[in-house]
Swiss-Prot record:
It comes from Rattus norvegicus. The gene is Slc46a1. Monomer. Disulfide bonds join 66-298. It is a multi-pass membrane protein. The lineage of its organism: Eukaryota, Metazoa, Chordata, Craniata, Vertebrata. This is Proton-coupled folate transporter.
């Protein structure tokens, strides 16, 4: 049964034959995140303005009289409904993606990384098309949820990241893997910074539609690159059925089947650590735009663009910081330093009532993203070379669950705490980050130099 060729497997053989050159995976991640970040804040602002119009709120947020709007009940209802629709989008994506991203990730261990990259690219492309229809035709904002679910059905950005990180693990040595993981995350940051700066200015100049069209064009290029230019990193791809429980079993076996070369405790606890880090990261990201739109900050689209750019700069600064700190510190200590700066940034956000203080919080996050590549690299070294896709699909599942928890906690907590402390969700995030800090330290103490699985030393 496992040897039967699926239609997707046939497509995989055609793609293999049509590859133009063996390109790296980093451009895919760059283009995907550029398109996503270009759409993300714009989608939040579009939902805000649509709800404002429906409720009769004029939607203006003049910064000189911003403080006088704090008691406006209509404004609070706009904030609450916008937060809830953001939650619905994330829940829709999670419920569909929980099954598909794990299935496709483990499947890529056998058929190669390219088929998953192509499917995930098509999903992101489809989501952009739905968003354009909503904006151009003034469709109900509930269609954003449909677009998110359709994207998750084909793997979503989490599936693309799973294949990308697995691809890096396929070709990197144990020594270089942490930096290669950070380099991939830096592509996310550079793309996010550029998209944020462009999106804010473009919205002010020409409205919502054109940025979504640019995102669509970028995603078309990305899909073509994945199909015809990406260099396959799995050494011997095999045609394998997609719809089989074997792929999900391979993920479960990572955590429950004993093996002399790996520690199930380290796998589970490092997964918990990255779960908490991602929960706080995406939870804060979910409410930051809403936090900045509302009183007392009342940012316009230009400032929101600058803020979103500053939010993505740590991907690049963390890469540089990681490279420098690795010369004098072990990876574990680098991760702990990153968590410390992340906690400081969250605390500043919680009490930020003026624009300079918000940007101070963004500045303190300059090393906040060194933690995740360290954890990913440690996880990758705990499993065999043939289990990288299963591992990173499991991590993608953890990411999806973390994003759902983030949306559920932060988007529900934010409107509930508007009356006594708007910044309370950021304080909660700062407190949660002590959990991975403790876990990483304890795991290093239990086994200071875990090298459970040695890969061939590829360049």
């Amino acid at each position: 049964m496992e040897g039967r060729v699926s239609p997707v497997g046939s497509s995989h053989r055609l793609l293999t034959a049509a590859v133009l050159f063996r390109g790296p995976v980093e451009p895919l991640v760059f283009l995907a995140n550029f398109a996503l970040v270009l759409q993300g804040p714009l989608t939040t602002q579009y939902i805000w303005h649509r709800i404002s119009t429906e409720l009769g709120y004029n939607g203006t947020r003049h910064r000189e009289n911003c403080g006088n709007q704090s008691a406006d009940p209509v404004l609070k209802e706009v904030e609450t409904l916008t937060s809830h629709w953001t939650l619905y989008m994330n829940v829709g994506g999670f419920l569909v993606g929980l099954f598909w991203s794990t299935l496709l990730g483990a499947w890529s261990d056998r058929v190669g990384r390219r088929p998953l990259l192509v499917l995930a690219s098509l999903g992101l492309l489809l989501q952009a098309v739905v968003s354009i229809f909503v904006v151009q035709l003034q469709l109900h904002i509930g269609f954003f949820v449909l677009g998110r679910a359709l994207c998750a059905l084909l793997g979503d950005f989490n599936g693309l990241l799973a294949a990308s990180f697995a691809s890096v693990a396929d070709v990197s040595s144990n020594h270089s893997r942490t930096f290669r993981m950070a380099l991939l995350e830096a592509c996310i940051g550079v793309a996010g910074t550029l998209a944020s700066l462009l999106g804010g200015h473009w919205l002010r100049a020409q409205g919502y539609a054109n940025p979504f069209w640019l995102a669509l064009a970028v995603l078309i290029v990305m899909t073509l690159y994945a199909a015809f230019c990406f260099g396959e990193t799995v050494k011997e791809p095999k045609s394998t059925r997609l719809f089989t429980l074997r792929h999900h079993r391979s993920i479960v076996q990572l955590y429950v089947v004993p093996a002399p070369e790996k520690s199930r405790m380290h796998l589970a606890l490092y997964s918990l650590a990255i779960f908490v880090v991602v929960t706080v990261h995406f939870g804060a990201q979910d409410i930051l735009t809403l936090y900045e739109l509302s009183t007392p900050l009342c940012w316009d689209s230009k400032l929101i663009g600058y803020g979103s750019a500053a939010q993505h700069l740590p991907y690049l600064t963390s890469l540089l910081g990681l490279r420098l700190l690795q010369f004098c510190l072990a990876d574990t200590w680098v991760a702990e330093i990153g968590l410390a700066f992340n906690i400081l940034g969250m605390v500043v956000f919680a009490f930020a009532t003026i624009t300079p203080l918000m940007f101070t919080g963004y500045g303190l996050l300059f090393l906040s993203l060194v933690t995740t590549p360290v954890i990913r690299a440690k996880l990758s070294k705990l499993v065999s070379e043939s289990e990288q896709g299963a591992l990173f699909s499991a991590v993608a599942c953890v990411n999806s669950l973390a994003m759902l928890m983030a949306s559920g906690i932060f988007n529900s907590l934010y409107p509930a705490t508007l009356n006594f402390m708007k910044g309370f969700p950021f304080l909660l995030g700062a407190g949660l980050l002590f959990i991975p800090a403790i876990l990483i330290g304890v795991l290093e103490k239990v086994n200071p130099h875990p090298e459970f699985q040695q890969f061939p030393q590829n360049s």
